[in-house]
Amino acid sequence: MLNEILASLQVLSLPTRTNFRSVTKREVALFKGPNGWGEFSPFLEYEKEEAAHWLGAGIEAAFGEIPLTNREEIEVNATLPAVDTKIDVENILSWYPGAKVVKIKVGGDLELDIQRIENALAVNPNYLIRLDVNGGWTVSQATESVSRIIERIGIEKIQYIEQPVATLDELRELKLPIPVVGDEVIRKAEDPFAINLDGAVDILMLKVSPLGGIKRAKEIAAHHKLPVVVSSALESAVGISHGIKLAAALPELKYACGLGTGKLLANDVADLPIVDGRIKVTNVNPSGMLNYQAAPERIKWWEERIRDSFEVWQARN
């Protein structure tokens, strides 16, 4: 299988439309199997043990079983990075026609965070707001910050907060009047099945690539018996389409999904149009890849990374 992956490998450098996670170009590796295309795009700093889960998700997409679906389209949220001007906020939100929910990056300067939220609500007062902290606050900071945000915009406007603090113990200690979503606490766990989320989070974030694929993500969700939100990890349309299939395969899906992040890329290998706040479940056939090919030295770097990650993945399976 490794030889098949490397034989069809396409390493691409896709420019972003905004600075997202300090990324201005997103490098992704695509490869083809009997089912179509898979993606391997762990962020550059990830070690092979973590990257192997991403490779497993790509292998599942290209070579594994095709999951049955329970729905034909998926509601998605808008994603608002840490931008500060009203014009930027209006522009980015226009990429998500019909979205009813906005995930907003917070955790920096609190006043700027609140202004960002207020600017989003100025675009559409009916938006529900999701706060995304990426574990950047202490317990006391989270308590104070959420209190101030609620004072300014009202608790009824906030759907939930994602990973307000970093650790499981901090999540248990933290008591907030809004639902808490576990993201990093599950996808960064050495064993997502072994951790006890009781009293720590109310909702589980599922990301198909970091969790190793649809089958494993569904097993994690079934194990923890919590409501789930499916989100992306800034993949290309190939990886996001696999996340959409995860969302479509779940028995229940209460929340809009964070699967519209392809709009944060200036160029992508396929279009996943958002219509009335929804994306259709579809197979992606990437095109125009020659336009985005990475430099030869980057291709060699990704080939070696795949070899290292495949060795870890194979040992686990």
What are these language model-derived features?
Residues Y46-G56:
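A short, polar/charged loop-to-alpha-helix boundary motif
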Residues L14-R21, E73-I87, K105-G108, G135-T138, ...:
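Active-site mouth loops of central-metabolism enzymes
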Residues I104-H242, A247, A266-I274:
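Catalytic core of soluble alpha/beta enzymes
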Residues E27, W37, I66-D84, R116:
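N-terminal small/glycine-rich loop or linker at the start of catalytic domains
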